């Protein structure tokens, strides 16, 4: 369903000012994107429009897209929810009006650990928090940890991840599989290598399998992903071979598909269905407690 609040207008004015040809083309293209995708980041919209040759592959082109998207939202032409932003967030403890409300929420959100019958655990590592809202729908559905590193992972973040893998192995004999989504540039490759190297160093003897899920060389060629100039400020920029491609250049549906396919290859359908059935029964027990309390 389209994320537009109302249909795209034919007027060539915005707030009384005439819109140029590029601005109109951007608005029309964004309108079309809402028919295909539920949510996107501004940078994903930019790459889609750059591939369509509506804007140039420059920071000026990005700012044009950013400006029109913001104006469309303020003018009521684009749902505020269409553009996702995982870079800002708030913390607040969850609270309830009544005990009954708390019990109802507990029953509604109850999740059984469906992976306990799969003898493994999965983590999806993501370089950019701006893309977290795109990926989290899949990771939440499959009850998989989404590890957002925001570029280079901190030593603490890596150590905690290694300790979680170690605990799973020593306590339950569960191996860890890591799927990493990082830019194809010097910084992204370095961040991915660090994960692959340091987790086993912190947890020697623990089976940790690392896979670079994206952006891969094959994806760049097969999907004709747009590139960008490499970050020359990176100390390893001169050593990086090939075109720099941001994770945002992967269309949302393909990004979601990558994650889901990676997860599903580890799922045994029969045991998963059994665990889901048990989960349903346990949730009904909780709902019965709510009814009795009422």
PLM regions and their residue ranges:
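Nucleic-acid enzyme cleavage-core boundary/entry regions
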Residues: 1-176, 189-294
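Acidic, divalent-metal-coordinating active-site segment for phosphoryl/phosphodiester hydrolysis
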Residues: 185
């Amino acid at each position: 369903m389209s994320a537009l609040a109302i249909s795209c207008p034919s007027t060539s004015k915005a707030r009384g000012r005439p819109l140029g040809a590029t601005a109109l083309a951007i608005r029309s293209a964004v309108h079309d994107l809402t028919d295909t995708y539920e949510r996107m980041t501004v940078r994903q919209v930019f790459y889609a429009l750059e591939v369509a040759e509506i804007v140039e592959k420059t920071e000026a082109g990005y700012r044009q897209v950013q400006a029109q998207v913001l104006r469309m939202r303020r003018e009521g032409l684009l749902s505020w929810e269409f553009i996702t932003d995982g870079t800002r967030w708030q913390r607040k403890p969850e609270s309830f009006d009544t005990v009954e409300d708390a019990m109802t929420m507990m029953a509604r959100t109850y999740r059984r650990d469906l992976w306990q019958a799969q003898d493994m655990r999965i983590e999806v590592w993501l370089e950019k928090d701006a893309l977290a809202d795109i990926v989290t729908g899949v990771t939440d559905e499959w009850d998989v940890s989404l590890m957002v590193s925001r570029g280079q992972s901190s030593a603490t973040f890596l150590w905690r991840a290694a300790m979680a893998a170690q605990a799973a192995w020593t306590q339950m004999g569960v191996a860890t599989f890591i799927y990493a989504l990082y830019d194809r540039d010097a910084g992204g490759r370095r961040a991915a290598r660090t994960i692959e190297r340091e987790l086993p160093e912190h947890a020697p003897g623990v089976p940790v399998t690392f896979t670079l899920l994206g952006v891969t060389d094959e994806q760049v060629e097969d999907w004709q992903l747009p590139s960008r100039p490499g970050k020359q400020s990176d100390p390893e920029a001169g050593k990086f071979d090939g075109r720099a491609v941001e994770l945002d250049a992967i269309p949302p549906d393909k990004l979601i598909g990558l994650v889901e396919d990676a997860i599903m290859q580890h799922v045994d359908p029969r045991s998963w269905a059994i665990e889901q059935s048990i989960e349903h029964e346990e949730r009904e027990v909780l709902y019965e407690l709510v009814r009795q309390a009422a």
